[in-house]
Amino acid sequence: MKLSLPALRNTPWFKATSGQWRYALRNTIAMCLALTFAYYLNLDEPYWAMTSAAVVSFPTVGGVISKSLGRIAGSLLGATAALIIAGHTLNEPWLFLFSMAAWIGFCTWACAHFTNNAAYAFQLSGYTAAIIAFPMVNIVEITQLWDIAQARVCEVIVGILCGGMMMMILPSTSDGTALLTALKNMHARLLEHASLLWQPETTDAIRSAHEGVIGQILTMNLLRIQAFWSHYRFRRQNALLNALLHQQLRLTSVISSLRRMLLNWPTPPENSREVIEQLLAELAKPRADSYTVARIIAPLCPQDEQDYRHLAFWQRLRYFCQLYLRSSRQLYLIESGAPVDQIHIRRTPGLARHTDNAEAIWSGVRTFCTLTVIGAWSIGVQWESGPGALTLAAISCVLYSIVATPFKSLSLLMRTLVLLSLFSFVVKFGLMVQITDLWQFLLFLFPLFVTMQLLKLQMPKLAGLWGQLIVFMGSFIAVTNPPVYDFADFLNDNTAKIVGVAISWLAFAILRPGSDAVKSRRHIRALRRDFVDQLSRHPSHSESEFESLTYHHVSQLSNSQDALARRWLLRWGVVLLNCSHVVWQLRAWESRSDPLSRVRDICISLLRDVMSERDVQQRPLAVTLQELQRICDTLAHHHQPAAHELAAIIWRLHCSLSQLEQAPAQGTLSPGYLMTPQA
């Protein structure tokens, strides 16, 4: 007994925490209920209800609601498209094939073009149409089209309802609590990030930390969406939460700007590091106030009016303190449940994002070509299991066109299908042939699914494999009503599914997604185009919108293995963002002195000469940097205080642009170019 006790403790059932048990039981009961209800509703393929319940098994209430709404909308759209296409083209195989391939290719483009629920809905509409329409090629009566379509949609809705009901019975962590906790943690992490970036060193760890902070803030936007659906309180506070995310992005920009000034400041005060550490320690306290912070940073107040570098750093540091204290106060009010009208915060739109249209179109073309090749082969050889291959190929192309590593995902799916083929053969022809009642089969499924759900949570490295095994198990076991046990059909169908995924893998290998270097160049060019727009009199993006758009560009390569492409995308984003903040500050800067106003306009025109959508002009850049330095030195000796403030702003612009002196040549990102990883 002593020997067996440690072994029992290492089993997934004894290792599981209460939260893991709640998650596993909730999802397992939902899947079993979905299968049961689909059977009693006499739906012909009830396993789709079980699969639908597995797909919407999100760990939070808001995630389940938002995912369910997207799934219902996508299923209805896909079913409608399948009915229209099949109803008009079913007697013409080639027209049917091209129409379906075009629709699923369009859905692939759309899910890459949009984000969150809209992207998920288009994903569902693409492979729902494939699930419904491709098996229709074997039907004889046209009236069966409606029966098949409504059965698939009903099965999906049954699974969603069961998943939602179990989430209400066994609820998990509140989305609002998760969002507020993430906001508070990020608020505290920004101080640690400031302490790291304001060091004089330049290492890869700084660049990685900057990318990590940007990615985490943008990820919190997904938590905001889930909280929006989970509780009416967060729907009322949605604009405020958006503003908080923008403020955290602005704090990140200010930290980067202060770092750039410290690196370009020849003689900073000797006590600057000591004062900064005291400041960060005070800001980390829950009850930090403006008076105490002002006393701490007072030793850094510039004494020489002509020292524009010191003045620029001082003004930006004060702005950072004010913004951080304001965010702390607003976070406290939101967490304490204060009424919306008592929280004085500037309402801002949602975070902006950029769509790589070239990559989205290429993904749609790849899907169209893949389905056309498989369909042509099926028609040419009269392959009865061709619909199965087409369905899995459609699912693979739609799902993995937007992931960072499609080959890894497709290889994992292939591994899943092989394992499920072997397992489903044993279950179907070893167990199910001996079962006469549904409850007997559920007695087998329940402990199996509970164990698989627990293993998915306890084995993070294999979570993707366990998740796919759970989702695809229903379609491989194929629990139909009435049950069918035909070994030849079983073998052909499973082979077709594996072949469909294999051809999809081949399509990704031939019609490869753009390399990270190519994507980086496209993002950099889009950044420059948007920045040139910022220099116009009436820019299309506000300061906050351009900031969030820039950070969205930077985050697109956060998982890339091409360090050079990531580094230059981050550098361009930081440079253009710092320059845009200076431009907006120059616009807001006013003086009664007409010569000073003309100097301000000259600085903005110098930026237009340096920057274009295609590249940065190196000769004008060097001349511009010299001219900006000359302007700063001249204004420093001006008798008006406004001139000193203008010199400080222009020096910030000089610090930001100096990073581009080693920019790579147009259209290249070659490792041969000298680059320093200064984030």
Curated annotation (Swiss-Prot):
It comes from the Bacteria. It is a multi-pass membrane protein. It is found in: Cell membrane. The chain crosses the membrane at residues 23-41, 46-65, 72-90, 94-113, 120-142, 157-179, 362-381, 385-404, 411-433, 438-455, 462-481, 496-515. Disulfide bonds: none annotated. The keyword Transport applies. Keywords: Cell membrane, Membrane, Transmembrane, Transmembrane helix, Transport. It holds the Pfam family FUSC. The keyword Cell membrane applies. One of its GO terms (molecular function) is transmembrane transporter activity. One of its GO terms (cellular component) is plasma membrane. Belongs to the aromatic acid exporter ArAE (TC 2.A.85) family. PANTHER family: MULTIDRUG RESISTANCE PROTEIN MDTO, P-HYDROXYBENZOIC ACID EFFLUX PUMP SUBUNIT-RELATED. This is Uncharacterized transporter YdhK. The gene is ydhK.
